[in-house]
Amino acid sequence: MNSPATLAAKLPWSEWLPQQRWYAGRNRELAAAEPGAVVALRDDLDLVLVDVSYTDGSAERYQVLVRWDAGPVSEFSTLATIGSADDHTGFDALYDPVAPQVLLSLIDSSAVRSSSDGQVSFAREPDVELPLDAYPRVSDAEQSNTSVIFDRGQAAILKVFRRVSSGINPDIELNRVLGRAHNPHVARLLGTYEIGIPGEPPEAACPLGMATAYAANAAEGWAMATASVRDLFAEGDLYAHEVGGDFAGESRRLGEAVASVHATLAEQLGTAQATFPVDHVLARLSSTAAAVPELQQYAGTIEERFVKLVDETISVQRVHGDLHLGQVLRTPESWVLIDFEGEPGQPLRERRAPDSPLRDVAGVLRSFEYAAYGPLVDHADDKQLAARAREWITRNRTAFCEGYAAASGNDPRDSELLLAAYELDKAVYEAGYESRHRPGWLPIPLRSIARLTAT
């Protein structure tokens, strides 16, 4: 068998990568895709970093684990087959039951694997156990990474980063801080792995993945909230608090959990004073309004709201950065926050920058609106449903803020103008996203923007 680097270079990366759901270059023209680093983890398993360049001059690096000549689970054979190189066939190893177990074992033993392209270092967290004999399955969640679940005994989930870059990964960083501080509202970090490139300083190492405790028997917040909305809509003669699926109690407990996480991050990593990020939100508003004609009628009012806060002093700290109901899980014991990676698509420096806790609060409040208004996308003229949706939103907003206030001593509603500004900034971001990816959902953020700019 040829060297790992030689074989990896012969795989048809330019054809395979664009078919993957975690590939971020769909709106750009691919110029080239070729391995930039290859490290053998064992004889038939290689870690490959694929360097992708685009005709607009931008570039990205993706992680793919390649298993040679061993087919994946049959249902994933088309998705996982990268292609042929000489007389060998390469597969995305995460869809093969053996390879994820190898990765978990390497983390458990804090192993090191090297080649001329780099050194891959695996590290287990102190005093943890990994389910080495558990059968892995790839999560079907739509996301920018690939997660493999080991659901047996001390269950774990291995998150393999796909688009990678050097520097401290905020998901690893904050999970480690919160776990070592024994905060009950995060899944405990079990281990990590990263690659160091020859000639680069240690701090330039590139994080590649992390294993955390798996929240077995957990329900996603989004699924719970949307089920509650469906129950309310089905009971036309009952108020929200009278419906069996009322979510307000969970919203209050979620507010308490978010406040707890914020308190731990402030205690462990500190706080500072800053001014409201007017330049940042105005830049987003300008670029989004230029791309979304439906937003332009509100742009002037939004700009006025932002500019009024130009001298506003705010307390900043490390926060989740992209909090919504899809980033929280309800276990039998409590709410758990996951995916501390920050806002998708932002540079690492910005994703690790301190921010106001109100950004996370606004993210949850915006998510309540999505949960309630989502069913109205196909019933835009149903005023009764719209009124029911607003009732549900108001009840759950109130419950969440009350829970946050009870746990932290600070009621987000006391910072009314700031909170509204963070909600507006989030809704502007959503308008840009929906315009590009789900035009039918664009009315959801626009409805909220109309409400926020009218008050």
Swiss-Prot record:
Gene3D superfamilies: 3.90.1200.10. Pfam families: Mak_N_cap. It is an enzyme of class 2 (transferase). The keyword Kinase applies. InterPro entries: Kinase-like_dom_sf, Mak_N_cap. Its EC number is 2.7.1.175. It catalyses: D-maltose + ATP = alpha-maltose 1-phosphate + ADP + H(+). GO terms for molecular function: ATP binding; kinase activity. Pathway: Glycan biosynthesis; glycogen biosynthesis. Catalyzes the ATP-dependent phosphorylation of maltose to maltose 1-phosphate. Is involved in a branched alpha-glucan biosynthetic pathway from trehalose, together with TreS, GlgE and GlgB. Monomer. This is Maltokinase. It comes from Mycobacterium marinum (strain ATCC BAA-535 / M). The gene is mak.
